[in-house]
């Protein structure tokens, strides 16, 4: 995640491109990716996938065009607070998550990264209710984020059919 780009404090593309080239694992690129040119620049670095920021959903038609153009090479981040999108690193307000999800489904989104921003970094467990509701409303693969805190939490997510989980603070 390029947090500098996500928060408008610069970017780290050269460093990220080097990391992607040199590490022997599959890498996803996230953080401040809100335009087609940013998607193309990100994909040119060689990651497996580029994750489109929630903020990009302000222009959901452009996101749908990116889904059509890049398919499985892009995922869409849904940063959520209640039933609302929480763009700009969870600081801003967006539209209704369920309406956005409906439009993304129609566009054929392959993968979603769903983050409950109220749990992000709190290590109090993932919001399995939210994730189950999203899973019930989309055929897309789902990556859970926000509050994931234990192997038991990950196992519970797996039982919901969630494809993967982002574990951050709990690793420390």
Please identify what each model-predicted range represents.
Residues 10-17, 60, 90-99, 124-133:
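Charged helix-capping and loop-helix junction motifs
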Residues 2-3, 25-26, 50, 87-88, ...:
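Short, contiguous strand/loop micro-motifs
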Residues 7, 29-30, 53, 91, ...:
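Residue-level marker of alpha-helix boundaries and capping positions
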Residues 8-9, 35, 59, 120-123, ...:
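Alpha-helix N-cap/loop-to-helix initiation residues
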């Amino acid at each position: 995640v390029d947090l500098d780009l996500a928060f408008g404090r610069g970017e780290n593309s050269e460093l990220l491109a080097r990391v992607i080239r040199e590490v022997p694992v599959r890498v996803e690129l996230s953080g401040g990716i809100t335009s087609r040119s940013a998607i193309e620049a990100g994909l040119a670095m060689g990651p497996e996938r580029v994750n489109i920021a929630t903020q990009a959903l302000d222009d959901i038609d452009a996101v749908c065009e990116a889904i059509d153009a890049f398919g499985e090479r892009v995922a869409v981040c849904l940063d959520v607070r209640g039933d609302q999108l929480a763009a700009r690193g969870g600081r801003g307000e967006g539209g209704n998550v369920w309406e956005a999800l409906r439009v993304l489904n129609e566009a054929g989104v392959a993968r979603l990264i769903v983050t409950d921003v109220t749990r992000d970094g709190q290590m109090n467990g993932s919001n399995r209710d939210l994730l189950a509701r999203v899973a019930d409303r989309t055929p897309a693969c789902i990556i859970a984020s926000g509050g994931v805190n234990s192997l038991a939490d990950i196992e519970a997510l797996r039982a919901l059919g969630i494809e993967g989980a982002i574990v951050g603070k709990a690793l420390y």
